[in-house]
Amino acid sequence: MEHYISLFVKSVFIENMALAFFLGMCTFIAISKKVETAIGLGIAVVVVQAITVPANNLLYAYLLKEGALAWAGLPDIDLSFLGFLSYIGVIAAIVQILEMLLDKYVPSLYNALGIYLPLITVNCAIMAGSLFMVERDYNFPESVVYGIGSGFSWALAIALLAGIREKLKYSDVPEGLQGLGIAFITIGLMSLGFMSFSGIQL
């Protein structure tokens, strides 16, 4: 149990998708203007990561990995070259289902997210979750914990940035730095803050 808690903490703070690896920056900056919308997208990312990382783990372990098809009497077949295509297919399917559910049950959030909801499909943070899982050779329970943790790390970062950007609206920001300029500086300072977690050994 301690191993899984360590993995979760590590994925949220030490290896934060947005502030340590700078993944998913396009959506991260575009949707972080309002806290409510940022939290909505953050929850969507957590849900997508929590489903796609374990799903891709099963896909890799029982279909794509070298020797994975031994159960079908094909031990010499290696389909790992289909990894990228397969992971994107799984991610696209999950995002499409999530989009339909939000459209039906939470139309206000669906409209607020707009084009950025289908763009989760090509959000590199989502893809990175599956690629890191394969690279680090996580088993299924580890991939579940890592999927939730990596999604939560991105959601936490965008919610924090949105809160800061809302406060900055009432601040006396120099004209040349208003908008994206101060947002990039804020992200850099947040990243420096999260670097302090890198000294923690888990």
UniProtKB/Swiss-Prot annotation:
Membrane topology according to the record: Multi-pass membrane protein
Role description: NQR complex catalyzes the reduction of ubiquinone-1 to ubiquinol by two successive reactions, coupled with the transport of Na(+) ions from the cytoplasm to the periplasm. NqrA to NqrE are probably involved in the second step, the conversion of ubisemiquinone to ubiquinol.
Protein's name according to its UniProt entry: Na(+)-translocating NADH-quinone reductase subunit E
Annotated organism of origin: Azotobacter vinelandii (strain DJ / ATCC BAA-1303)
Subunit text: Composed of six subunits; NqrA, NqrB, NqrC, NqrD, NqrE and NqrF.
Catalytic activity: a ubiquinone + n Na(+)(in) + NADH + H(+) = a ubiquinol + n Na(+)(out) + NAD(+)
GN (gene name): nqrE
Keyword 4Fe-4S: no
GO biological process, one term: sodium ion transport
Pfam families: Rnf-Nqr
Uppermost EC category: translocase
Keyword Thylakoid set for record: no
UniProt EC number: 7.2.1.1
Location, primary (coarse class): membrane
Entry GO CC: Gram-negative-bacterium-type cell wall; plasma membrane
Native organism taxonomy: Bacteria, Pseudomonadati, Pseudomonadota, Gammaproteobacteria, Pseudomonadales
Family: Belongs to the NqrDE/RnfAE family.
